[in-house]
Design a protein with these regions (language model features):
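Helical hinge/lid and interdomain linker segments adjacent to catalytic or ligand-binding clefts
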Residues: 2-88
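Short, solvent-exposed loop/turn segments at secondary-structure junctions
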Residues: 6-7, 58, 85-87, 153-155, ...
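Alpha-helix N-cap/helix-start motif
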Residues: 11, 61, 90-91, 158-160, ...
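Extracellular ligand-binding/catalytic regions of CAZymes and related secreted enzymes
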Residues: 20, 24, 43, 156-162, ...
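Catalytic beta-strand/loop cores that center a nucleophilic Ser/Cys/Thr
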Residues: 20-28, 100-175, 180
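Short, hydrophobic secondary-structure boundary micro-motifs
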Residues: 31, 105-106, 212-214
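A glycine-rich, often tryptophan-bearing local segment used as a flexible ligand/cofactor-contacting loop or short
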Residues: 58-127
Length: 214
């Protein structure tokens, strides 16, 4: 779990919530707020099945990006959550890896709609209602991407089409699971969000890790 030291999207507060919730299901995290610690050493990164990113890190160094991209393309899982789709703006390929980039938001109580109930990343996932930021995305990368949840258009939206909300991608041997959910504790405390991350993490981890898990 790569977070950050910030009062905005305070991962230091939310990490314990998800660690406790998913720890009950034998999904365990190491936590850091340092991009260098998480991505600077390819061997260290390679010890993990999945990297979860929830932070506002503006830049990434070339060697860090190389390690992240190699980790995914060689079979690692990548789970960028919410504001992670804003990260690393100095590396254009990062948006393509995630599948899109955060553009703007408002805020409201809403429920994102599941559009593909049969995808394994949606196993046991149900739509849940909570206050969250109403993300819009840009720089979409449809290659090897499957949208699994959408946010239907709301008052004040710049367009009337459903907004892609949760999606999966594959790149090389790796799997990427992204969701725009996760602004604050109203979401991070929600059991529906816990299940969404659990299913997404297990899918992103890949079949060999799933075999060990079961």
């Amino acid at each position: 779990f790569l977070g950050h030291n910030s009062k905005h999207h305070p991962s230091n507060e939310y990490y314990p919530l998800i660690a406790k919730a998913l720890g009950r299901d034998a999904i365990y995290f190491d936590y850091t707020t340092s991009v260098e610690e998480a991505l600077g050493d390819a061997k260290y990164l390679g010890k993990f099945d999945v990297l979860l990113l929830y932070a506002n890190h503006g830049t990434i160094k070339p060697n860090q990006w190389k390690n992240l991209k190699s980790f995914v393309e060689n079979g690692g899982g990548f789970v960028p959550v919410h504001c992670a789709s804003w990260c690393f703006g100095n590396e254009p390929e990062f948006d393509q890896l995630v599948g899109g980039r955060f553009k703007s938001h408002q805020g409201a109580i809403f429920s994102a709609r599941v559009t593909d109930t049969k995808h394994p990343a949606m196993k046991d996932v149900k739509a849940f209602e909570a206050w969250d930021e109403t993300y819009f995305h840009t720089n979409h990368n449809p290659k090897n991407r499957k949208v699994l949840m959408v946010r239907d258009a709301m008052k004040g939206d710049p367009h009337t089409k459903p907004e892609p909300w949760t999606w999966v991608r594959t790149q090389g041997k790796g799997r990427i699971f992204y969701t725009a959910s996760g602004h604050d504790a109203r979401v991070w405390n929600h059991t529906g969000f816990h299940q969404l991350l659990k299913s997404g993490i297990l899918w992103a981890a890949g079949e060999s890790a799933q075999t060990r898990y079961h």
